[in-house]
Amino acid sequence: MSLGALYVVSGPSGAGKSTVCKLVRERLGINLSISATSRKPRNGEQEGVDYFFITAEEFERKIKNDDFLEYANVHGNYYGTLKSEVEERLKRGEKVLLEIDVQGGVQVKNKFPEANLIFFKTANKEELEKRLRGRNTDSEEVIQARLKNSLKELEYESKYDRVIINNEIEQACNDLISIIENGVK
């Protein structure tokens, strides 16, 4: 049995990663690897579908037990990828899609050099801000923190194998599907 392939999607908050990954997952019939997080669910998010929602204390126990392939504290909340889920799926020959922060993407690449890292971004800062405000889920303080953090996240772009500028959802979906189906690096 051949090993599967690992695809890591990262980029600033508001770049459209979640939207595109959800559509690609539906179209290709592959499952997004579900990350764990200590943050509260957003409207419409479901436990075990969008994330494993756990307490900060439980997350810290899992860190101590070395249960994560990668993890980070982003905007005051923990996010991480459980090693067991990814390793089992790769052994079964599945294509695994991770949607994680840029620091986590680099951590994964260090542990799995064959991973395909795909960086999502918007055409400009104004579009990013428009999308963040359009969510209607974050306070002004959180939006400003996310915008400030996006400048740091953009510095990681060169560490990624491919870049998708998400100006239009359908084109971004097609670009990601092409990378997954063709193994294009």
Swiss-Prot record:
SMART domains: GuKc. CDD domains: GMPK. One of its GO terms (molecular function) is guanylate kinase activity. It catalyses: GMP + ATP = GDP + ADP. Residues 4-181 form the Guanylate kinase-like domain. The keyword Kinase applies. Belongs to the guanylate kinase family. Essential for recycling GMP and indirectly, cGMP. This is Guanylate kinase. It comes from Fusobacterium nucleatum subsp. nucleatum (strain ATCC 25586 / DSM 15643 / BCRC 10681 / CIP 101130 / JCM 8532 / KCTC 2640 / LMG 13131 / VPI 4355). The lineage of its organism: Bacteria, Fusobacteriati, Fusobacteriota, Fusobacteriia, Fusobacteriales. The gene is gmk.
